[in-house]
């Protein structure tokens, strides 16, 4: 959440990797106020599978375990990062729409969270922007 660590030489990685780095660094700058807000790491007995931070009406949640339910708050905009090895996450929270993106920022889909529990298709290493409606 705070400081990125880039442990590769940018001139020695493929362009697709550099594109991913550029995208995530720009996204980190965009979400700086959220990243600097207090962190809440959940379920220490499960090795913190969910970490979240919120600033005003924007929240960021990172999910590290595909077996977790991502509980959405009342934030207007929530960024849900998929740090698991699967292509979908189970979300709890209705009346929201989402747009998912891959790790380079390319849109991969849209969906609605119409039921209290809904699966969202989010690429591994990607994220979704959830908007309350």
What are these regions (language model features)?
Residues 1-125, 131-132:
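Active-site-proximal substrate-binding groove within the catalytic cores of carbohydrate-active enzymes
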């Amino acid at each position: 959440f705070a400081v990125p660590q880039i442990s590769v030489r940018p001139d020695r990685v493929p362009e697709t990797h550099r594109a991913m780095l550029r995208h995530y660094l720009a996204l980190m700058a965009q979400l700086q106020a959220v990243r600097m807000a207090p962190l809440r790491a959940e379920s220490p007995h499960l090795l913190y599978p969910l970490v979240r931070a919120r600033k005003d009406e924007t929240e960021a949640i990172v999910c590290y375990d595909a077996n977790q339910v991502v509980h959405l708050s009342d934030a207007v905009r929530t960024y849900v990062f998929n740090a698991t090895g699967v292509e979908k996450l189970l979300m709890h929270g209705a009346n929201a729409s989402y747009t998912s993106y891959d790790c380079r920022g390319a849109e991969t889909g849209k969906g609605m969270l119409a039921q209290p529990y809904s699966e969202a298709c989010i690429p591994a290493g990607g994220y979704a922007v959830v908007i309350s409606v």
